[in-house]
Amino acid sequence: MSDVTVVNCPTCGKPVVWGEISPFRPFCSKRCQLIDLGEWAAEEKRIASSGDQSDSDDWSEER
């Protein structure tokens, strides 16, 4: 007996089998994959941080 892992598509919530039969995993389709990429590119999604580091003295573009 083989265990099949099923995850929900992060874009639409549709169930996706985690395996070679699902080439866009964790997404259900290329469309959902591109929607997610567009959200990251438009900065609608971001990785949470502990604070605003834009004014940090540790970061400098000067060499």
UniProtKB/Swiss-Prot annotation:
Cofactor note (record): Binds 1 zinc ion.
Pfam families listed in its UniProt record: YacG (PF03884)
What does this protein need as cofactor? Zn(2+)
Q: Which gene encodes it?
A: yacG
Name the positions where Zn(2+) binds. C9, C12, C28, C32
Organism whose genome encodes this protein: Salmonella typhimurium (strain LT2 / SGSC1412 / ATCC 700720)
Instruction: Fetch the Gene3D superfamilies from UniProt.
Output: Erythroid Transcription Factor GATA-1, subunit A (3.30.50.10)
* Matches recorded under InterPro entries: DNA_gyrase_inhibitor_YacG, Znf_NHR/GATA
Name of the protein: DNA gyrase inhibitor YacG
